[in-house]
Regions:
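Short, small-residue-biased leader/transition segments that mark boundaries at the very start
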Residues: 1-5, 283
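Polyanion-binding loop/helix "lid" in catalytic or ligand-binding cores
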Residues: 7-17, 57-76, 80-83, 145-163, ...
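Long, well-ordered hydrophobic secondary-structure segments characteristic of membrane-embedded
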Residues: 11-15, 19, 24-32
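Short beta-strand segments at enzyme active-site cores
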Residues: 25-38, 89-94, 168-171, 210-216, ...
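Glycine-rich loop at the start of a catalytic domain that most often binds anionic cofactors/ligands
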Residues: 33-49, 224
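Short, active-site-adjacent cap segments at secondary-structure transitions
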Residues: 33-37, 99-101, 176-178, 217-221, ...
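Short, hinge-like loop/turn segments at secondary-structure boundaries
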Residues: 44-47, 109-111, 187, 227-231
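Ligand-binding beta-strand-loop-alpha-helix segment within the catalytic cores
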Residues: 46-168
Length: 283
């Protein structure tokens, strides 16, 4: 792992330990985009070099990324808690999330994945039935679908750990997308939007608060314009209006607002925050 990644884990662990020290019970999710891309590329390159190996499917790559990041996070948080004299078990739950096979997202893939490819490599990907887009001047990249999360398979395990007063990391990278086929769960060639999965997890464990951490203290409307305005406390109705007006784009802030609105509206007395790590202490 790079030094930057290690510093990020250490910083994240401190911020989460602050919340736990304040008396909060936490379930933690995380993104996995860089790691998933790296694992997927490595698996494909290995399969090219060793023809008797089959490339690992997307679902397996997602599982690997949960183990990779979960391992570092749980040890970072555990160490930080022990340094403060707090004795709590921290564990990562390998989490599968059921998606709808008829989700419209499967017909319009949007999430780029892995390294840039040349035209020949892109053609090989297309022959496998994968979607590829061209980024002018850079090359080609694979794109995968981002279906909505329907149900978290291991939810009861997460709840049991929380009931035992443990710190839980779950639904990392949005969870491993799976399709229900009778009693069988089949991995889907997709990624789940991590913010929506976080909201689904928060609903499932009946959390009082959903906190989505990003790199800005406050989200702005009219971003980059003269009338740019940072948002403070708003209602779900206001949030929906801003979403309809297109203030939050498609791929960045919009899923965070969708998850927040769904979570708050599903049950009375809930709140959601979209803010930075540094602003956690003000919540």
């Amino acid at each position: 792992a790079s030094d930057v990644y290690k510093r990020q884990v250490k910083h994240t662990a401190k911020c989460i330990a602050d919340l736990i020290e304040e008396g909060y019970q936490v379930a933690i999710t995380h993104s996995n985009a860089p790691q998933l891309g790296m694992i997927h590329t490595a698996m494909n390159e290995f399969a090219k070099a060793h023809k008797d190996y089959t490339p690992a499917p997307m679902s397996v790559c997602s599982a690997m990324s949960q183990g990779y990041i979960g391992y570092d996070l749980q040890n970072g948080i555990r160490e930080e808690l022990l340094n403060r004299g707090i004795y709590r078990t921290v564990s990562t739950v390998l989490t599968q999330v059921i998606v709808d096979p008829y989700d419209e997202a499967f017909y319009t893939p949007t999430k780029v994945l892995g390294r840039y490819m040349n035209a020949q490599e892109a053609n090989e990907e297309r022959k496998k039935g994968n979607y590829v887009i061209e980024e002018p001047g850079k090359g080609f990249r694979r794109v995968v679908s981002a279906p909505n999360p329907v149900k978290i398979v291991e939810l009861d395990a997460v709840k049991a750990l929380l009931d035992a007063n443990q710190v839980v990391i779950a639904a990392g990278g949005g969870g491993i997308p799976v399709l229900e086929q009778d009693n069988h769960l089949r991995g889907a060639s997709a990624v789940i939007e991590k913010d929506l999965a976080a909201g689904k997890l928060a609903e499932g464990i009946d959390a009082e608060m959903l906190i989505i951490l990003t790199n800005v203290e406050k989200v702005c409307i009219n971003l980059g314009q003269k009338d740019e305005e940072p948002l403070g406390e708003i209602t779900t109705e206001q949030a929906k209006t801003y979403m309809e007006e297109g203030h939050f784009g498609i791929y960045n802030m919009l899923p965070k607002f969708r998850a927040s609105v769904d979570f708050v509206e599903e049950c009375e007395g809930r709140s959601a925050y979209i803010t930075s790590f540094l602003s956690l202490i003000h919540i």
